[in-house]
């Protein structure tokens, strides 16, 4: 039940962020660009979680903390297409071919600007952190560069 509520919440946030009810077309980018963006996004989310855990983490178990790290990765996977819409707009505004550094900067900006603390407070305050499962451990064990996304680079 907790996972269902978490999933519904993520889908509502997806629709709210995309501001549309239609299908978001896939945007494919070079594998090097994808990897650098994933690393920066997940590291930004993990920095927010680490800071949040320093303040609020005493009342959470180790498994709940691991689940919140899973939430970071799943949130990035869920919203990848919407990030790509924003990134494509920013790259187009540069007026030149993109470089790896541009995608690094944009990934870091996404990781910094998305307020994940809201989700941590929401999940922990309502006792909605789901139990830690094997599929969560499998995703957490992956390096940020290896986290699968729907439209992986070529």
Swiss-Prot record:
Signal sequence segment: 1-18
GO annotations of cellular component type: acrosomal lumen
Covalent S-S links between cysteines: none
InterPro entries attached to this UniProt entry: Egg_lysin (IPR001379), Egg_lysin_sf (IPR035916)
GO biological process: single fertilization
Source organism superkingdom: Eukaryota
Alphabetized UniProt keyword annotations: Cytoplasmic vesicle, Fertilization, Signal
Tissue expression: Sperm.
Subcellular location: Cytoplasmic vesicle, Secretory vesicle, Acrosome lumen
Principal cellular location given in the protein's record: cytoplasm
Functional note: Creates a 3 um hole in the egg vitelline layer through which the sperm passes. Does not have enzyme activity. Species-specific interaction between the sperm protein lysin and the egg protein VERL exposes a basic surface on lysin that may dissociate the egg vitelline layer via electrostatic repulsion. Plays a role in ensuring species-specific fertilization.
Record note on quaternary structure: Monomer. Homodimer. Molecules associate into dimers and then rapidly dissociate again. Interacts (as a monomer) with the egg vitelline layer protein VERL (via VERL repeats); each VERL chain can bind multiple copies of lysin.
Name the record gives this protein: Egg-lysin
Organism: Haliotis fulgens (Green abalone)
């Amino acid at each position: 039940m907790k996972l269902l509520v978490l999933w519904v919440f993520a889908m509502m946030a997806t629709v709210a962020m995309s501001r549309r009810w239609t299908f978001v077309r896939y945007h494919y980018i070079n594998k090097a660009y994808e990897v650098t963006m994933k690393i920066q996004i997940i590291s930004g989310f993990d920095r927010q979680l680490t800071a949040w855990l320093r303040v609020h983490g005493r009342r959470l178990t180790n498994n709940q903390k691991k689940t919140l790290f899973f939430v970071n990765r799943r949130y990035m996977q869920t919203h990848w297409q919407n990030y790509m819409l924003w990134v494509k707009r920013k790259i187009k505004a540069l007026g030149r071919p993109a470089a790896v550094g541009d995608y690094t900067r944009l990934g870091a900006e996404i990781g910094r600007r998305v307020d994940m603390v809201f989700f941590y407070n929401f999940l922990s305050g309502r006792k909605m952190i789901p139990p830690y499962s094997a599929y969560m451990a499998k995703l957490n064990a992956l390096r940020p560069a290896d986290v699968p996304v729907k439209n992986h680079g070529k």
